[in-house]
Amino acid sequence: VSQSPFFATDIGAPEGPVALPDGSLYVTEMSAGTLRVTHLTPDGRRRVVLRTGGRPNGLAIDGDGMIWIAEAGLRALIRIAPDGRELMRIEGDGSERFCFPNDLAFGPDGHLYMTDSGLALDDFLDGQDFAEGFMDFDWDGRVYEIDPKAGKVLRTIDRGIRFTNGIAFDAQNRLYANASFPGDVYRYDVFGSSAPSREFFGNVLQPDKRSGFKGPDGMKFGLDGRLYCTVYGQSNVTVLASDGSVADRLMLQGDAPTNCAFARDGQTLLVTEVGVGRVEKLSVPCGGLPLHYPKVG
């Protein structure tokens, strides 16, 4: 029996994959008719966890098995139980609202780190499409550190980024976030400094003749120390070596990958793709660097 290259198909613009120990997967669905968090099993079953009503983007789970949603449409970070009950909602840092919560990564300190792309959806979308000239708008993308127990923003690590998107920690506990428009990945020494500087790490864009938007999206570290970054509009996962250089480009069947998660049981990267609406399985040379799952209570 040949293995299908797809974990799931016919999903409404999937994002935010979170691999669970039993082989199943949480994803968000961002298409206009879905707007929900969905649980997918390898044998094809699916369960709607919650219709959020906004536009859910990135996801993370904590050590209690609760789900954190970066809700771009509602401009909120929301914690829910697996049955869909809302447990907490954070809408800003006390002085200003979030604009576009995008993606999430728990740190080794038990705090939750979140990217905010830097403009509200209504300010750069024209219907379902990007408004004309959107890349030149006044983007104020941010990286936040959040105390999940208290439900409050502790610090803004960076801002003024042109569409902050993917976020991940490496094995040395350094934080990485990417900027979709320039294609850059930045690194922050969040535990070595109270005001860490933005350090250029690498760039994932490749020169090609394609028109249309291309840019880095969700990303994860492998046990090989390399960063696996989905590149929307580029049909690949671009792999950056530990020095930030491009080590590989893993081609996908779909043009528009949005995010990825390593399966818990081995050398498979699960990639969400919004062009066709499916989760693609990619063979990779290693497992994923274990994520942090702090108990929040």
Which sequence ranges carry the predicted segments?
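A short loop-to-beta-strand structural motif that recurs across blades of beta-propeller domains
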Residues: R36-T38, A76-I78, G141-Y144, D184-Y186, ...
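Asp-box/WD-like beta-propeller blade repeats and closely related beta-sheet repeat scaffolds
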Residues: L77-E132, D140
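Blade-level signature of beta-propeller repeat domains, shared across WD40, Kelch, NHL, RCC1
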Residues: N259-G297
